From Swiss-Prot:
InterPro entries named in the record: DUF2129 (IPR016979)
A Pfam cross-reference name: DUF2129
Family listed: Belongs to the UPF0298 family.
Domain of life: Bacteria
Principal localisation: cytoplasm
Source species of the chain: Halalkalibacterium halodurans (strain ATCC BAA-125 / DSM 18197 / FERM 7344 / JCM 9153 / C-125) (Bacillus halodurans)
Protein name: UPF0298 protein BH2594
Length: 92
């Protein structure tokens, strides 16, 4: 099975009764009842077209893309601080 890269998006709705309709656009990961938004995952290739389709619906307030694929996860300076390293050896 080939895995494709997915990207998340937060879709803010006017009412949650329309949340079930979003299942045809991707995988619905989470639905917030209090803040009325849906976290939706879809393929990276179809993100722009899906976003345009979602924004055209009358029940969608806003669509925001997740920036997680663009955030750097490898850090340059990964050495621990000398003072903290000494405290760990002491057992504090």
């Amino acid at each position: 099975m080939l895995t494709s890269n997915r990207q998340g998006m937060a879709v803010y709705l006017t009412s949650l009764k329309f949340a079930r309709q979003l299942r045809r656009f991707g995988y619905v990961h989470y639905v917030s009842k209090k803040m009325r938004y849906v976290v939706l995952y879809c393929n990276e290739e179809a993100v722009q077209t899906t976003m345009e389709k979602l924004q055209s619906f009358h029940f969608v307030k806003d669509v925001q893309l997740s920036m997680r694929p663009y955030v750097q996860t490898e850090f340059q300076n990964a050495k621990p601080d000398k003072a903290k390293e000494y405290d760990y050896k002491m057992g504090l």
